[in-house]
Amino acid sequence: FNLDNNSKPLRDYLNQIMEHMEDYPISDMIRTHWVTVEGDWNWKCVQDNFNESYHTPYVHPGLKYVAEEKYQACQFDMYESMHSRLLMPGFMPSVSVYEEEDKVLELIGPHIEYWDMKPDDYKGRLLDIRGDLQKQKRKLDKEKGYDFSKFKDTQLTDHYHYTIFPNMSFSVKPDGMQWLRGSPHPTDPTKCIFDYWYLT
């Protein structure tokens, strides 16, 4: 729905993002979790944070155990449409926690156990988890109710995070996605209304 009769079609506005999303089964997903909060920050700060990975060590300190969240390991794409994409390697712990193997396996464990992988098999082999999980997801996708045939290996494990100008972000995987939206507070510019949705 758009109040501007002269606006360009949504597909044209989203441009590359629309092309990237074509293989994801979004229309088959349902919203399973959602929350709306009022925050003590301006909505533009929220969007700026989701557009980079500098904030992850402070806002998401546990992420380093399950993803290589350092900005040097991530790919950032800015499009002429003012939208952007962040690619972050998942199921590959950050270099900073290689010595914390037990903690890494504790946090990655439930995710890989779902795909019939044993965390203890990866003692001394943390960097093998990502590739093995990609193979295992391909092997078991139909059995688990998925079809990953249209996706690249990295799409099965890594964080593909998009920011749509001006105030929407989402992370997507073939088996689920989360939507994040920061909106201006109706009366206080130092506050924000923040919506979070998870679809699977």
What is the meaning of each model-derived region?
Residues 1-200:
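C-terminal catalytic domain of Rieske-type non-heme iron oxygenases
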